[in-house]
C-alpha cells in the first residue's frame, strides 16, 4: 500500500491554527494539495544573490543618430548630465555637432542584503590579482639569478633538482634572506645588540658602580679611565674615534649582502670588507672626477670654482660668548652715533657752518653770518654787524637809515645830547621791563594759590556784564 504524499500543511503543524483552517475541506480536490493555501502565513525565505554587482561600462543598445533633448551636451548620452560625463571633453559637444553620439549606460538597481552590503570583496575581480602574482614571480626569479648559485636557482625554477637538493637550496636562500620558516618567532624578532653595556666598559670592581634597580651608572661609572670617555650621559654613548668609520663599513657590508654582490661578514673577515670598500670608494671618486672634468671642459667655468681669498676672513664659528640686549645690539659695546639719512656737514656758498646751527626769534639760520635765509651767500662778520644794527633799529635804539641820510653828522656840542637820549631810552626800557615783571605771577605765588586781597580786588574789578543777575537790577 503506497502512502499518500504529505502536503505542505502537514509538514509543519501549528497548534495555533484552528482545525477548520488547517484541515482540508471536502470540496477541495487532491490535485491542488501541492498548492499551500496558507502560503501567505508561512515565513518567506528569499535567497538573495550576494554575487550581484554592477556591470561597469555596459551600454544599452545602439547609440542614437541625433541629439536628444535633455541628453549630455558632451557625448549625447541620456543617462547623465554634462558635468557628470566621464568622456573626454570635446571642443564642440554632441549637442552642437550631432556627431559621435554615445550609447546610454545601463542603469542597474542592485539591491543587496545585510551581508552583501558588508562584504568587502563584493564586486572584486580575482583576475586583477594575477598581475601581482606575475610581478612577485619575476622578482623571485631576479633574486635567484643574482645569487652566486644562479645555475642552481635556474634549476629550481625549471624543476630539475631533486627534493634533497631543492631543500638545501631553499635553506640557503632562507638563511640569506632571513625569512625562513625554520626560524622561530622569537629568533626572528630578536634584535642583534652589538653595543657594549655600560657596566661592561670597565670591569674594575672599584670603578664602575652599577645600580641594577634603576639600571644606571652611579656617578657615571669610571671617571679616570678610557672607558668613561665614551659615556656622555645617561643612555648615550658618544661616537668617538673610529666609530663613524666602523658604522660606514658595517652599512657597506649589509648593503652588499642585500644586493647579492658579495657575501661580506665584517666580524668574520674585516680585512676583505675594508679592502673592497676602499676599492669601491676609489672607483666612485675616479668616476666623479672624470665626470666633473668632462663637464668643465665642455662648459667651462673652472675659475668660479676656485676658493675666494676673502673666505678666510669671513666670520667663523667660535666659542666666544656674546650677550645681546633688548634692541639686538651687543651688551656692553660702545654705542655709535646714529647717522642721519640726510647728508651732513655739507658747507655751501662760502658758509663755515651748516644751516640750523643758529637759532633766533623762532628761526633757524647760519651761525657764521646770522643769516636766516637758506642757501644764501655767506657775509661773515659784516653780516653779524648788520644783523645787530637791524635789531637795535627795531628796538628804537638807533635812528633809521632815512633819518641818518637826511640829517648831517652831529657836531661836538650835540654829542652829549645823543648820549643823554641813549641813557633816557635805557631807563625807559628798564622801567617797562620792571612793570612787565610785576604783572607776571611768580612760581611761589602760583604754588601758594590766590590770596584774599587778590580775590577781593578781582571781584571789584570784574565787569557787571559777567554777572548774570546784573540785568535784573532796576527793573522792579
UniProtKB/Swiss-Prot annotation:
Binding partners and assembly: Associated with the spliceosome.
Biased composition (Basic and acidic residues): 414-444, 456-465
Subcellular location, record wording: Nucleus
Coiled-coil region list: none
One GO term describing the cellular component: spliceosomal complex
Keyword Manganese listed: no
Protein's UniProt name: Pre-mRNA-splicing factor slu7
Record's keyword terms, sorted: Metal-binding, mRNA processing, mRNA splicing, Nucleus, Spliceosome, Zinc, Zinc-finger
Zinc finger (CCHC-type): 70-87
Native source organism of the sequence: Aspergillus fumigatus (strain ATCC MYA-4609 / CBS 101355 / FGSC A1100 / Af293) (Neosartorya fumigata)
Family: Belongs to the SLU7 family.
Protein role: Involved in pre-mRNA splicing.
InterPro entries: Slu7_dom (IPR021715), Splicing_factor_SLU7 (IPR039974)
UniProt keyword annotation of NAD present: no
One GO process term, biological-process aspect: RNA splicing
Pfam families: Slu7
Transmembrane segments: none
Gene Ontology molecular function, alphabetical: pre-mRNA 3'-splice site binding; zinc ion binding
Main location group: nucleus
Renumbered residue ranges of the record's region Disordered: 396-476
Amino acid at each position: 500500500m503506497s502512502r499518500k504524499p504529505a502536503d505542505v500543511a502537514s509538514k509543519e503543524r501549528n497548534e495555533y491554527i484552528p482545525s477548520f483552517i488547517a484541515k482540508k475541506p471536502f470540496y477541495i480536490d487532491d490535485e491542488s494539495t501541492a498548492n499551500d493555501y496558507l502560503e501567505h502565513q508561512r515565513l518567506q525565505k528569499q535567497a538573495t544573490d550576494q554575487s550581484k554587482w554592477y556591470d561597469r561600462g555596459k551600454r544599452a543598445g545602439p547609440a542614437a543618430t541625433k541629439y536628444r533633448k535633455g541628453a549630455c551636451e558632451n557625448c549625447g548620452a541620456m543617462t547623465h548630465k554634462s558635468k557628470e560625463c566621464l568622456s573626454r571633453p570635446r571642443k564642440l559637444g554632441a549637442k552642437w555637432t550631432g556627431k559621435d553620439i554615445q550609447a546610454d549606460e545601463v542603469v542597474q538597481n542592485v539591491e543587496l542584503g545585510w551581508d552583501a552590503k558588508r562584504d568587502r570583496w563584493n564586486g572584486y575581480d580575482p583576475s586583477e590579482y594575477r598581475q601581482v602574482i606575475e610581478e612577485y614571480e619575476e622578482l623571485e626569479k631576479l633574486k635567484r639569478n643574482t645569487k652566486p648559485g644562479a645555475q642552481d636557482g635556474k634549476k629550481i625554477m625549471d624543476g630539475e633538482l631533486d627534493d634533497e637538493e631543492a631543500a638545501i637550496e631553499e635553506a640557503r636562500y632562507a638563511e640569506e634572506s632571513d625569512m625562513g620558516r625554520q626560524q622561530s618567532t622569537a629568533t626572528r624578532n630578536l634584535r642583534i645588540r652589538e653595543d657594549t653595556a655600560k657596566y661592561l666598559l670597565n670591569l674594575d670592581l672599584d670603578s664602575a658602580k652599577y645600580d641594577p634597580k634603576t639600571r644606571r651608572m652611579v656617578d657615571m661609572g669610571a671617571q679616570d679611565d678610557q672607558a668613561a670617555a665614551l659615556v656622555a650621559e645617561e643612555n648615550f654613548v658618544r661616537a668617538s674615534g673610529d666609530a663613524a668609520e666602523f658604522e660606514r663599513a658595517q652599512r657597506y657590508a649589509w648593503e652588499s649582502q642585500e644586493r647579492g654582490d658579495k657575501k661580506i661578514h665584517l666580524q668574520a673577515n674585516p680585512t676583505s670588507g675594508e679592502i673592497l670598500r676602499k676599492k669601491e670608494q676609489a672607483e666612485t671618486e675616479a668616476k666623479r672626477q672624470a665626470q666633473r672634468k668632462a663637464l668643465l671642459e665642455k662648459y667651462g667655468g673652472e675659475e668660479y670654482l676656485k676658493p675666494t681669498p676673502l673666505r678666510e676672513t669671513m666670520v667663523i664659528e667660535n666659542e666666544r660668548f656674546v650677550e645681546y640686549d633688548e634692541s639686538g645690539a651687543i651688551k656692553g659695546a660702545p654705542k655709535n652715533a646714529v647717522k642721519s639719512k640726510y647728508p651732513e656737514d655739507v658747507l655751501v656758498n662760502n658758509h663755515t657752518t651748516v644751516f640750523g646751527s643758529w637759532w633766533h626769534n623762532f628761526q633757524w639760520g647760519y651761525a657764521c653770518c646770522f643769516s636766516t635765509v637758506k642757501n644764501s651767500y655767506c657775509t661773515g662778520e659784516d653780516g653779524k654787524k648788520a644783523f645787530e644794527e637791524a635789531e637795535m633799529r627795531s628796538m628804537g635804539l638807533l635812528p633809521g637809515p632815512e633819518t641818518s641820510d637826511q640829517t648831517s653828522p652831529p657836531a661836538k656840542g650835540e654829542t652829549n645830547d645823543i648820549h643823554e637820549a641813549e641813557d633816557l631810552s635805557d631807563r625807559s626800557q628798564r622801567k617797562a621791563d620792571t612793570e612787565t615783571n610785576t604783572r607776571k605771577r611768580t612760581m611761589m605765588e602760583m604754588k601758594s594759590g590766590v590770596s584774599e586781597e587778590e580775590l577781593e580786588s578781582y571781584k571789584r574789578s570784574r565787569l557787571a556784564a559777567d554777572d548774570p543777575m546784573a540785568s535784573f537790577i532796576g527793573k522792579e
